[in-house]
């Protein structure tokens, strides 16, 4: 089983990346959050991997963080949620935010995520509350991120351009250290370059 891949980003798609590891290109399915956190094409990337073996295919799912992988693995244990659905859910909500919503039985918040209806949200709360409790406690109460100013404007601009909030958050956070003294348009160009890979 493959647990981790490290290599060059050969290409990026809407929901996947091809990672060149020793001359072999691995197609790895990713959430929007993990995809946004990867460097542009040609850069070095490292992903945690879940290998899904089906009768007709072997699929690799990648994660930029241990938390996202843990939530993904918990999601696929829920009846009716397969790897693709779990990936789509994690593209619509951050792993820690999902854990907090489940821990708080926030069905209304969960139903705002594309692909989660009321019944699925209720099932997630019932089946995952204990599994995700530790992660939700580690996340703590929802808190404002430091350095709101131009980084928050960048995040909002990306959402206005059609990027999902988790994608916009990841891209804006990746540029947080570079934000000081830069104008919004400069940061927006850099964020778009990274998102398009």
Curated annotation (Swiss-Prot):
UniProt keyword DNA repair, yes or no: yes
Region (Flexible linker): 141-145
Family annotation (Gene3D superfamilies): 5' to 3' exonuclease, C-terminal subdomain, DNA helicase RuvA subunit, C-terminal domain, Nucleic acid-binding proteins
GO CC terms in record: cytoplasm; Holliday junction helicase complex; Holliday junction resolvase complex
BP GO annotations: DNA recombination; DNA repair
Region (Domain III): 146-197
UniProt-listed Pfam families: HHH_5, RuvA_C, RuvA_N
Subcellular localization(s) per the UniProt record: Cytoplasm
SMART domains (alphabetical): HhH1 (SM00278)
Keywords: Cytoplasm, DNA damage, DNA recombination, DNA repair, DNA-binding
Region Domain II, annotated ranges: 65-141
Transmembrane parts of this sequence: none
Record InterPro entries: DNA_helicase_Holl-junc_RuvA_I, Hlx-hairpin-Hlx_DNA-bd_motif, NA-bd_OB-fold, RuvA, RuvA_2-like, RuvA_C, RuvA_C_sf
Region (Domain I) location: 1-64
Family affiliation: Belongs to the RuvA family.
UniProt note: domains: Has three domains with a flexible linker between the domains II and III and assumes an 'L' shape. Domain III is highly mobile and contacts RuvB.
Quaternary context: Homotetramer. Forms an RuvA(8)-RuvB(12)-Holliday junction (HJ) complex. HJ DNA is sandwiched between 2 RuvA tetramers; dsDNA enters through RuvA and exits via RuvB. An RuvB hexamer assembles on each DNA strand where it exits the tetramer. Each RuvB hexamer is contacted by two RuvA subunits (via domain III) on 2 adjacent RuvB subunits; this complex drives branch migration. In the full resolvosome a probable DNA-RuvA(4)-RuvB(12)-RuvC(2) complex forms which resolves the HJ.
Function: The RuvA-RuvB-RuvC complex processes Holliday junction (HJ) DNA during genetic recombination and DNA repair, while the RuvA-RuvB complex plays an important role in the rescue of blocked DNA replication forks via replication fork reversal (RFR). RuvA specifically binds to HJ cruciform DNA, conferring on it an open structure. The RuvB hexamer acts as an ATP-dependent pump, pulling dsDNA into and through the RuvAB complex. HJ branch migration allows RuvC to scan DNA until it finds its consensus sequence, where it cleaves and resolves the cruciform DNA.
The protein's name in its UniProt record: Holliday junction branch migration complex subunit RuvA
Organism: Anaeromyxobacter sp. (strain Fw109-5)
């Amino acid at each position: 089983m493959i647990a981790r891949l490290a290599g060059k980003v050969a290409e990026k798609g809407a929901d996947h990346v091809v990672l060149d590891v020793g001359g072999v290109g691995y197609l790895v399915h990713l959430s929007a959050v993990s995809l946004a956190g990867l460097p542009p094409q040609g850069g070095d990337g490292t992903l945690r991997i879940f290998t899904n073996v089906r009768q007709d295919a072997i699929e690799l799912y990648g994660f930029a963080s241990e938390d996202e992988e843990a939530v993904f693995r918990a999601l696929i244990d829920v009846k009716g949620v397969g790897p693709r659905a779990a990936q789509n859910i994690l593209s619509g909500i951050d792993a820690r935010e999902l854990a907090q919503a489940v821990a708080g039985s926030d069905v209304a918040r969960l139903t705002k995520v594309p692909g989660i209806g009321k019944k699925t949200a209720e099932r997630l709360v019932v089946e995952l509350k204990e599994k995700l409790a530790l992660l939700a406690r580690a996340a703590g109460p929802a808190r404002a991120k430091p350095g709101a100013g131009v980084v928050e404007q960048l995040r909002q601009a990306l959402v206005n351009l059609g990027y999902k909030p988790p994608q916009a958050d990841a891209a804006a956070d990746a540029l947080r250290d570079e934000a000081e003294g830069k104008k919004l348009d400069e940061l927006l160009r850099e964020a778009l370059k990274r998102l398009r890979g």
